[in-house]
A protein has these predicted regions:
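Transmembrane beta-barrel domains of Gram-negative outer membranes and organellar outer membranes
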Residues: 1-126, 133-137, 155-161, 165-198
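Glycine- and Gly-Pro-enriched alpha-helical subdomains that act as flexible
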Residues: 143-144
Length: 198
């Protein structure tokens, strides 16, 4: 996958292919995104949405469309992971524009470097993913630290996969690498993915 749940992997879309995504959020929010494979190594996408599209509150839109770019630098081999660089400016939740924060509740990844490695198991493919990111657009809160993220996915069969990821959120909540712990903050997500195959 090009992403786990929110965490980017080193994979990119194939040339000429596209991906349409919709994310439902807490509070009736919704984000729509479209990505296209420009080459076998480079993908480009845009996303836009609202933190309260569903419901009876006064409709608010995010201040701008957000970008999603990724370029695979190094192909994965038997001994080394695939490596990609990218830019993702789409955060999640409310966009706090009226105060001094000027940021999403959950910051976007911003610039990132991601690495992915796959192995064949008796069940199917097992992949581990990790990376580092720096958000340069949501820094009015005074927290400009780089961030770390990790994840894994494992196939149960050709259609179903289990996904787990952890966004350390080192650029939020005064988290640092010295205090890094799941019990102290960050975002831990898990999901079951159903891929329709012919």
């Amino acid at each position: 996958p090009t992403d786990l749940i929110t965490v980017p992997t080193a994979a990119t879309l194939m040339r000429g292919s596209f991906s349409l995504g919709m994310r439902i959020q807490d509070g009736g929010g919704m984000i729509l995104g479209l990505r296209a494979g420009i080459t076998d190594r480079f993908q480009f996408g845009l996303s836009y949405g609202s933190p309260n599209l569903i419901g009876d509150d006064s409709l608010r839109w995010y201040p701008r469309p957000e970008a999603n770019l990724k370029y695979m630098l190094i192909d994965e081999s038997i001994t080394s992971p695939g490596i990609a660089i990218g830019l993702n400016t789409q955060g999640f939740g409310n966009f706090n524009q009226g105060d001094s924060l000027n940021r999403y509740d959950m910051k976007a990844y911003g610039f990132y470097l991601s690495a992915s490695k796959n192995w064949k198991t008796s069940l199917g493919n097992l992949a581990l993913h990790s990376g580092v990111s720096y958000n340069f657009t949501e820094t009015d809160d005074g927290d400009e630290d780089p961030n770390l993220f990790f994840g894994m996915d494992i196939e149960l069969n050709p259609e179903f996969s289990v996904l787990m990821e952890y966004n350390a959120a080192l650029n939020e909540n005064n988290m640092t690498t010295e205090t890094l712990a799941i019990s102290r903050g960050g975002y831990l997500n898990a999901a079951l993915r159903w891929t329709f195959v012919e």
